[in-house]
Every structure is written in C-alpha cells, then in structure tokens.
Amino acid sequence: MKKKWLAAALAGILLAAAVLSGCASTEKAKRLRFGVAGEGGIYREFGERFAALENETDNGQVELKATAGSAANLRLLTGEYLQLAIAQADLVQDAYDQTGIFADEEEDRGFGAVAALYTETCQVVVRADSDIRSIEDLHGRTVSIGAEESGSEQNALQILSAYGLNDKMVSMVNLNYEDAAAQLKAGRVDAIFMTVGAPSPVLTALAGECDIRLLKVDGAAAQRLMSAYSAYNTVTLPAGTYPGQTEEVQTVGVKAVLLASSALPAKQVQQLTQLLFSSREGLEEQLGIPLDPEENAVEGVGIPFHAGAAAYYKAAGITVDQTAGN
C-alpha cells in the first residue's frame, strides 16, 4: 500500500512539474520584447501606447526595449533578442535583402512585416537666425545626423550625398533627437537631421524655445535620392506644422514599419494586427499623427508579411506576399 501511495504521489509531482513547466514555457513564449528607440521620437511613444493595449489582453506581455533606432532594431530582431520592432522601410528592405549597411551580414532574416504604420518625414532643421538656406549651405558646418545605428543617420548620409556632400565637407556628429535639439538651441551645431513623424514633439518644443527653419529636400537632388532608393517618397510639411512655420516645406520621407519575428506563431501576430487596427483612431489621438488604414498599411513596405498579418489582411479582403510564422 505504501509503495502504491509513493508511486501515486511521485506521478502527481511529475505531472504537476510538467504542467508548471508547460505554463512557464507558454509564459516565456508570450513575453514580447519590443524594440523601439530612445526618448523624443514617435517609435517610443507608439511603443508605449501599443504595449499598454496589448498588456491588457492575454495575447502576450510586451516589454519595451530602447535602442538607437532602425538599424539596431533590425539587428536585434534578426538575432532573436526582439520579437517585435519598428524600423524604417528603407532599412527594412536593406536588412531583408542583405544590402546597404547590412551587405556583409550573413544571418537569416527571420522576420516579416505586420504593417506600415505612418510616414516618417526627413526633417532638416536650422535656427531661423542662421545664414543656412539650403542643404548645399551645410558645406563646412557641424551637423547632427542622428544617433549611431539610427535610420536618421542613414537618411542624413544619403541626403547629403544627393547634394554632393560627404564627411570631408561636413562635420558630422551623432546625437539623439533631444540632445541634437539642445545643441542646436545652444548654437553648438548648425543643423540637425531627424527622420520622424511630423509634427515631432521634440521639434515642437524646440520651436517654442527658439525660432527654427526647415530646409527643403527637393528638385534634382530629391529625384536622385528617390531613383537610388525606392523607399523614399515626396512629402509636404504644411505651413503651421511647427510654431513659426509660415510656409509649406517640400521634403522626402519613408514608411515606419512594424515587424514581427518569424518565431512568433501566426495566431499571435494575427491578434496583434487586429489590435493595431481596432485601436487605430485612439492611437492617432494620443500620438497626434495619422496612422495608415489597412489598405495603405500594406504599401511601401518592401518585404513579405508575417503569416499572421497576412491572415488578418486576407480576412479584410487584402492580399499580400507572405513569409514567416507558423
């Protein structure tokens, strides 16, 4: 009898351990590290608000990870440290195709698109009392090109190159958005590049503290840029986007894309996609920028979609190229 009791007890313990182990494994699988960026950008603001929505569901608990931006997010997503990330469409395509700054990297690109979220505008800003009137005038000046490993850095280098400028002609420094704004206000840098949804809270705050002017990215240089890099499109910043801005400004922009790891189950990503679009209007109000609806969220992405996102779009009557997921 005693042996039978011990055997039964042992079996019960093993069963409980297996159940607990399974629960722990499931819990771990549902924990989602979400790569955003540092303070002052829309990536961080979007991530905070979307994570709050997701954490109210039983689909997964989101943990935000602050990074330098797009390039860093793509490397961390490829390395399976992140399960979700936001990145600029131009760098997303480079990472997926292993071109550009990702040309020498051999890792498999284990991710798919969820949605294009909004257009990020390339904004080149100087003080209003500066004698800098065009990108060409940045020759011989000190310019913040964004944080190292950020999308802004790559866009700044590409835009400067389109105007015939390089690091021998321009003194380039890597600063995050908030530090760049502070340095411009103090007169320690002559211009700052920011690729971010407009209006940017950092630039709005800066314009309230000192008068600023936005430089145009247009004409033949913009055409060269868009011919060389298909992810760029033309953007017009309306007058009044920022305090003191009395005229519209022509520039270029790229899509910000939400990405998911191939390791995430299709059902989980489908639920995330559903949450994104069912919450779109509320997110727009909180962020102060328009988010793409379903029909626009599949454009300008440049890579196939995660199987879970593809399932969501199929149910909405939209067909997309699919990769990744199970």
What are these regions (language model features)?
Residues 41-78, 84-85, 245-246:
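Extracytoplasmic small-molecule ligand-binding "clamshell" domains
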Residues 89-91, 98-102, 130, 167-258:
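Pocket-lining segment of extracytoplasmic ligand-binding domains
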Residues 1-10:
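Bacterial N-terminal signal peptides that target proteins for export
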Residues 19-22:
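C-terminal motif of bacterial Sec signal peptides marking the signal peptidase cleavage site
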Residues 104-117, 122, 241-250:
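A structural signal for short loop-to-beta-strand junctions that line the ligand-binding cleft
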Residues 175, 179, 186, 196-214, ...:
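An extracytoplasmic/periplasmic, membrane-proximal ligand-sensing/linker region
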Residues 24-26:
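Bacterial signal peptide processing site
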Residues 29-62, 120-186, 299, 303-308:
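Bilobed "Venus flytrap"/periplasmic-binding protein-like clamshell domains
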